[in-house]
Amino acid sequence: MSGPNPPGREPDEPESEPVSDTGDERASGNHLPPVAGGGDKLPSDQTGETDAYSRAYSAPESEHVTGGPYVPADLRLYDYDDYEESSDLDDELAAPRWPWVVGVAAIIAAVALVVSVSLLVTRPHTSKLATGDTTSSAPPVQDEITTTKPAPPPPPPAPPPTTEIPTATETQTVTVTPPPPPPPATTTAPPPATTTTAAAPPPTTTTPTGPRQVTYSVTGTKAPGDIISVTYVDAAGRRRTQHNVYIPWSMTVTPISQSDVGSVEASSLFRVSKLNCSITTSDGTVLSSNSNDGPQTSC
């Protein structure tokens, strides 16, 4: 039973009614002994003394839990006549865009892979990429043309020297009278030997001419992201290819044959760059040029 209990029991409560079983006890022959010092007290008087200990705890009103005031529901929240359909359904029905993005990225990656493999396969002779300011020249196989000049003819033999033998003179003396002493004998000195030496011809000096150098040049405008390949003829007459070169590009070689001009070709991978080419010698002579501003040029 909840709630506070009154300090005393109500006389009308059935629990407070005294129960007297004296008739039964007497009939059964069982008599309870009287309590010492208790007198004749009824059971109801004995339970009243311990009633204060059996009361339930009653909380004060300040601790009672009370609900807030009643607020009726707003009927406008349940009005579906003015409900507008959300645009999220349209977004869900629209086709997603990410498959297109993934497809385009896959195509670009495949094209880049094919281009990279083709570049690695088609350059067996090139070991490094060319830079914009790098010019290299292959050493000539034959530096100069050597000519052997004939030895000068030996000088003619000198004629033998001419010597004259003096003739002996005999002097006869007469002992009749001592004549005056004879004059001293005169001896003729031999003329000096004449030696005729032929003048040697002046030596012929041959000045070797330096080998002619040929410069290949590629000019124009390179588009961003484009790959330009250049093919030229080296000093030995073999075709060389350089990939992904910078513009302007130049290469100087010394061909073995002085009559060989060589050739140079340049091409754009994506055909968006404008290229020109020229071939000039070391003295500035233009052997060939092409200024078509096209994605592919050759000289």
Swiss-Prot record:
Biased composition (Polar residues): 128-139
GO cellular component terms listed in the entry, alphabetical order: peptidoglycan-based cell wall; plasma membrane
Domain of life per record: Bacteria
Disulfide pattern: none
N-acetylserine modifications at: S2
Alphabetic keyword roster: Acetylation, Cell membrane, Membrane, Transmembrane, Transmembrane helix
Principal location listed in the UniProt entry: membrane
TM stretches of this protein: 101-121
Pfam families the record matches: Mycobact_memb (PF05423)
Topology in the lipid bilayer: Single-pass membrane protein
InterPro entries assigned: MmpS (IPR008693), MmpS_C (IPR038468)
Keyword Cell membrane recorded: yes
Biased composition (Pro residues): 150-163, 177-193
Chain intervals with Low complexity compositional bias: 164-176
Cell location: Cell membrane
Stretch list, region Disordered: 1-72, 128-213
Family membership: Belongs to the MmpS family.
Protein name according to UniProt: Probable transport accessory protein MmpS3
Source organism (scientific name): Mycobacterium tuberculosis (strain ATCC 25618 / H37Rv)
